[in-house]
Design a protein with these regions (language model features):
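A short, internal acetyl-CoA/4′-phosphopantetheine-binding micro-motif in the GNAT/acyltransferase core
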Residues: 87-98
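A conserved beta-turn-beta hairpin within the catalytic core of GNAT-like acetyltransferases
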Residues: 77-88, 144
Length: 152
């Protein structure tokens, strides 16, 4: 296993192609309410050199040259709080131990950049959501917001 920061748009698209195939069934069963994740929308929106180097920070867990996990964090100035934030955008992995290596890598990166605040989330429909919430709390995260969705 190796963790690699993804800064190249072609490599970013390859990671998403590999993960979409790898997690297709899981995404259908445990994904977000109403809305499946759109691989192409993510690639089109974030797969640009300037964004991957400055705003959307992406790390992939590579095994035998193929992506088996990815974590993405958005770095931005939160205008409500007047603070730079590091917000989890997407996180998926086939191995919880390797998955947390991705998270630790991202958090270390944010700390080195001097970012003071990090937000993380979890999908309610996922079987391990309650366990993940407890892990977040053990890591020092505090519950701040709940999000609700309704189809109109």
């Amino acid at each position: 296993m190796s963790i690699k920061k993804i800064i190249n748009p072609e490599e970013f698209a390859k990671v998403w192609d590999e993960l979409e195939i790898y997690f297709r069934e899981e995404n259908k069963t445990y994904g977000h309410r109403y809305l499946p994740i759109s691989k192409q929308s993510v690639i089109d929106s974030w797969g640009h050199t300037a964004l991957l180097n400055n705003t959307m920070h992406v790390w992939a867990n590579l095994e035998d040259g193929k992506a088996r996990g990815v974590i993405m964090f958005l770095e931005y100035m939160n205008t409500t709080f007047g603070e730079k934030m590091f917000t989890e955008y997407f996180w998926i992995s086939n191995d919880s131990r390797k998955s947390f290596s991705l998270l630790k890598t991202a958090l270390s990166f944010a700390k080195r950049k001097g970012i003071k605040y990090v937000t993380v989330s979890c999908v309610e429909n996922y079987p391990t959501s309650e366990r993940l919430k407890k892990v977040y709390q053990k890591m020092g995260f505090h519950k701040d917001t709940e999000t609700f969705i309704k189809k109109l």
